[in-house]
């Protein structure tokens, strides 16, 4: 099975790329939604997170600029997300599975997990227009260096152009 990471900074267009992939029949693991589900379904996970970050769970969004709290959170949550993704991949039955995540690149928990990487990029002004919280959360992200991406999608035109780029990526990967 080929596992492909779709990454990019917040509001770059990862979700729209993955929506196109799903529309074409590819299984896509949405790490944000899946993580929220894990918080609700794993008994005691919220308490473990609170203990790790030293704050109430309701304040989890305030840790993005606190590197030590963010790393403590990642140490608790990322292994669970990775295990959940592996189960998803094993059960999807396809030859290719996509993993959507703004933060998986460069994290040791995900090293060696993906066969290919797709970097979705968009101009800063456009990302800020799409999501005004870009500034608040950007500190928690590291964009993949261009030379480490197997494929780059430049999301600076319309939706049809984005879909066309996804289609070209599929052809380039021969999947």
What annotation goes with each model-predicted range?
Residues 1-57, 164-175:
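Glycine-rich phosphate-binding loop of ATP-dependent small-molecule kinases
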Residues 1-2, 19, 58, 87-92, ...:
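Catalytic phosphate/metal-binding cores of nucleic-acid and nucleotide-processing enzymes, i.e., regions
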Residues 4, 29, 116-118, 151-153:
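Hydrophobic/aromatic beta-strand patches that form the interior of the parallel beta-sheet core
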Residues 33-95:
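ATP-dependent small-molecule kinase phosphotransfer cores
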Residues 34, 123-126, 158-159:
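Conserved nucleotide-binding/hydrolysis micro-motifs of P-loop NTPases
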Residues 38-40, 127-133:
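Short, charged, surface-exposed secondary-structure boundary motifs
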Residues 84-91, 96-130:
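ATP-dependent NMP and nucleoside kinases share a basic, alpha-helical "lid"
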Residues 85, 93, 110-112, 131-175:
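Small-molecule kinase domains that catalyze NTP-dependent phosphoryl transfer to phosphate-bearing small molecules
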